[in-house]
Swiss-Prot record:
Superkingdom classification of source: Archaea
UniProt keywords, alphabetically: Amino-acid biosynthesis, Aromatic amino acid biosynthesis, NAD, Oxidoreductase
This enzyme's EC code(s): 1.4.1.24
Name of this protein: 3-dehydroquinate synthase
Gene responsible for this protein: aroB'
Taxonomic lineage of the native organism: Archaea, Thermoproteota, Candidatus Korarchaeia, Candidatus Korarchaeales, Candidatus Korarchaeaceae
Function: Catalyzes the oxidative deamination and cyclization of 2-amino-3,7-dideoxy-D-threo-hept-6-ulosonic acid (ADH) to yield 3-dehydroquinate (DHQ), which is fed into the canonical shikimic pathway of aromatic amino acid biosynthesis.
Database matches in Pfam families: DHQS
GO BP term (any one): amino acid biosynthetic process
Top EC class, one word: oxidoreductase
Family: Belongs to the archaeal-type DHQ synthase family.
Length: 334
């Protein structure tokens, strides 16, 4: 699944929204020269996507489609530069024609709203490479970030288990969602917010228990849990009504609501692992029904886990957290 870009159109968005978008990791596009200059006054220019109108060439070339002859021009030129498409009437059909001919890797489109953005990102199941969209307020910006998460998978990677150690009794949290979790779906949890383990849901059949397709036994109350917007929650904070991320083995993610957080005292096990020089750990309940996920998508129960086994993890570039939000500062967790 190739990555997609959701870019904020600065020309039609308040400066406060533009600044917040940058902090959330979204790019900003500017078409009007005065807007470009204003943004350069308080933003790093590298964060601004330069847009130039056809036939001038910028990071993105704005091209207006008025009729079939314009589609023909795009077919000829699309391999030479990245185009930002603006259509005065029909949007989907012209883009379908372009994507069918040249693919969507160098094609971007202007969307009027988030629903249209979602449609454009999925044209012919390939979709455009990115959408440029005006955002009016913080609520819209949050929804835009959710959409960006939906269409961009997390980069899960392989980690080698280095230690499995029983650590006595502790309080663990079962996160019961209001959704049915599919095979291969679970949640990302860990003792460090920058190194999270994929814990599979309890939707696997066993001789002794019925499956709980809505549940992830996420471990100790002190564990971090990945939530929408790139934020984390302590498991102790999760309760009915919280929103968390369900993550699949291929990195796809979706927001799900919590119907209940079930805290009970159980025997616990510490699992440590390393990946490309990074180290992390998690504390989970010691039981046959708590599975981690292997790189091939199969599962391994924590009761069967041993040093040398390989499991899937997510390692974040940003290490520090302030009330669950990633920040760029030094922090050491151990």
């Amino acid at each position: 699944m190739r990555s997609k870009e959701l870019i904020i159109l600065a020309d039609s968005s308040p400066d406060s929204v533009v600044e917040k978008a940058i902090k959330m990791g979204l790019k900003v596009a500017a078409v009007d020269q005065s807007v470009k200059e204003r943004l350069k006054g308080y933003l790093d220019p590298s964060l601004i996507v330069e847009v130039s109108e056809w036939p001038s060439e910028g990071e993105l070339t704005l091209f207006k489609i008025r009729g079939p002859e314009d589609v023909e021009i795009l077919r000829r030129e699309a391999n030479e530069r990245k185009f930002l498409i603006e259509s005065e009437s029909w949007k989907i059909i012209p883009l379908e024609n372009i994507i069918a001919e040249v693919g969507g890797e160098r094609i971007y489109a202007i969307a009027d709203d988030l629903e249209e953005a979602r449609s454009l990102l999925g044209v012919l199941e390939i979709g455009v490479k990115g959408v440029v969209i005006p955002i009016k307020d913080s609520a819209q910006l949050e929804r835009a970030l959710r959409l960006s998460e939906e269409v961009n998978p997390l980069n899960l990677r392989e980690a080698r288990v280095t230690e499995v150690k029983q650590v006595g009794m502790g309080d663990r949290v079962c996160v019961d969602t209001t959704s049915i979790l599919s095979k291969g779906e679970g949640m990302l949890v860990g003792g460090s917010a920058s190194f999270l383990f994929l814990v599979h849901s309890e939707n696997i059949e066993s001789p002794f228990t019925s499956p709980r397709e809505f549940r992830v036994n996420a471990g100790a109350v002190s564990n971090y849990l990945l939530a929408p917007g790139g934020k984390t929650l302590y498991l102790s904070e999760v309760r009915a009504g919280s929103e968390v991320l369900a993550v699949s083995v291929d990195g796809r993610r979706r927001a799900v609501s919590v119907g209940r957080a079930k805290v009970e005292r159980r025997p616990m096990v510490l699992v440590r692992a390393s990946s490309d020089g990074e180290e992390g750990w998690t504390v989970l309940q010691l039981a046959e029904t708590i599975p981690l996920v292997k790189p091939d998508g199969s599962t391994v129960a924590v009761t069967d886990l041993k040093p040398g086994d390989r499991v899937l993890v997510y390692v974040s570039e940003r290490k520090a957290r302030h009330f669950g939000t990633a920040v760029d500062e030094f922090i050491e967790e151990r």
